[in-house]
Amino acid sequence: MTTLAIDIGGTKLAAALIGADGQIRDRRELPTPASQTPEALRDALSALVSPLQAHAQRVAIASTGIIRDGSLLALNPHNLGGLLHFPLVKTLEQLTNLPTIAINDAQAAAWAEYQALEGDVTEMVFITVSTGVGGGVVSGGKLLTGPGGLAGHIGHTLADPHGPVCGCGRTGCVEAIASGRGIAAAAQGELAGADARTIFTRAGQGDEQAQWLIHRSARTLARLIADIKATTDCQCVVVGGSVGLAEGYLALVETYLAQEPAAFHVDLLAAHYRHDAGLLGAALLAQGEKL
């Protein structure tokens, strides 16, 4: 059975056909509409899936935000242009006439990355560092989503009580500091207004402020990982996302994690499926996982 998998992120929308063998084909992308109106997202999703839907028997959605009763509830609306709520399952069923499931994108990615691990691993945490910071937790070999869909939203744990206000309403969240949006928001002077990609480029060219911003992000993530180890005693942490997979970033996180007491050390791995983990995880879950 072929699944039409959709990944809804803060920067881009992606869709692909995924067969029972896990092979991805006909992958497509569109920018995420920067609009508070549900109609803008619906129109973008329609354009994305219309060339693919005739070749699929079901739809699986991996989306940023809390997924509850098939709807997207934005924990940080800034990541979706201010959109607060969107009926994901209902909308895609109307657009495609296919049975549809939905799950948080980081939770979906966690499940895909867990399947790629070698050895006897039952406890794993996945972290994505991208427009925002998200996560997924596998414990006892099972994906934890929680009764309200909140499990794994580790980007909204506290990093600095005196830090910037996060879009979720809290102050000093990991996401407000370590994410691509957080990196860009802290830039000053000649870097003011630059996006995270530009800041990484400037850091590679020796710009001291850019390097400081990236080190600040990596240090914040390392402290989060130490907290995660203390909370879950996970066997490994897998890191993905556009920032998490940027050249040199994971090595920085490892350097800062090594400065924590040994009890909080844990193996760090780069995401095996890289930017396709959300699509693959949603498709895998559609094959039999009850959400």
Swiss-Prot record:
UniProt GO molecular function: ATP binding; N-acylmannosamine kinase activity; zinc ion binding
Chemical reaction(s) catalysed: an N-acyl-D-mannosamine + ATP = an N-acyl-D-mannosamine 6-phosphate + ADP + H(+)
Source species, domain of life: Bacteria
EC number per UniProt: 2.7.1.60
Residue positions binding ATP: 5-12, 132-139
Pathway assignment: Amino-sugar metabolism; N-acetylneuraminate degradation; D-fructose 6-phosphate from N-acetylneuraminate: step 2/5
Pfam families the record matches: ROK (PF00480)
Function: Catalyzes the phosphorylation of N-acetylmannosamine (ManNAc) to ManNAc-6-P.
Subunit note: Homodimer.
UniProt-recorded name of the protein: N-acetylmannosamine kinase
Provenance organism: Escherichia coli (strain SE11)
Chain's gene name: nanK
